[in-house]
Amino acid sequence: MKQVIVITGASSGFGALSARALARAGHTVYAGMRETAGRNASQVAELEYYAAEHHVDLHALELDVVSTPSVEAAIAKIIADCDRLDVIVHNAGHMAFGPAEAFTPEQFAQLYDVNVLSAQRVNRAALPQLRKQGRGLVVWVSSSSTRGGTPPYLSPYFAAKAAMDSLAVSYAGELARWGIETSIIVPGAFTKGTNHFAHSGSPADKTRAAEYNEGPYAGLAEQALKGLAALEPPDADANAVAEAIVSVVDKPFGKRPFRLHVDPSQDGAEIVNGVADRVRAELLRRIGLEDLLRPYARS
């Protein structure tokens, strides 16, 4: 069944790959990104060329996830165009790399804004439509770092992604009775095929960072990145994340997985998440809320 889908952070990386893959699968896709007439104008042109060349229903959408007016306008446009919205893909995110102490509190807040509050802005704008329809799907692009191995120097990103994952889990139960499903996609560390690492932020406090990088932790940054790259199999492909999202969207209502891991490096997140998700399910059963584990078919 053809779905109307919005993806945040779709100018590059998993978002761009997923937008194209979902459009190829026959869906109407709105690829959200900021500054469509500015810094991302070339990405918009590439997307429009791709849509025309492949004859798919794919559209660039001005959507700045840190701006409530921008988010509200974007969602309103989709509903005006299509009279519905079926799937939200929370993909927008930004990485930062460096010693935790060298990042200012303001930098932590900014990462939290992009990685966590952005999803809340989109949900507040879009969920009323999904609830009205009595059916929908919310896909969250999480990270294996929330429960798997955590190499050093990525603390702002890890903390934000952990918060996002917790938000996704909480929303799942609160949306089930509205007929809205939740699927959490858990990518591992893909050092190739995305700009995640290349475009990562750095600490604002250069003096504090230097104390680490020129002191007992000299060379650690290079060692950590080299180690992550070495763990990644040669055939690891970021397109696998896009394919996982397509597979979830294309499954029938009630058959979509709550969590799906795409982690070529196998950092242990699947094991820990399996335990955590089972504990969650057991608690809901113990307090008489087992029905929240599955969406209720309302339409």
Feature-to-residue mapping (PLM):
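Active-site loop of short-chain dehydrogenase/reductase
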Residues: 2-3, 84-85, 130-143, 178-181
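The beta1-alpha1 cofactor-binding region of Rossmann-like NAD(H)/NADP(H)-dependent oxidoreductases
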Residues: 61-73, 105
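Substrate-binding pocket helix/loop in short-chain dehydrogenase/reductase
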Residues: 99-100, 107-109
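A short, exposed helix-loop element centered on a Lys and neighboring polar residues
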Residues: 123-124
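Catalytic loop of short-chain dehydrogenase/reductase
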Residues: 139-163, 169, 173-176, 188-202
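C-terminal beta-strand-loop-alpha-helix "lid" module of Rossmann-like NAD(P)-dependent dehydrogenases
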Residues: 181-231
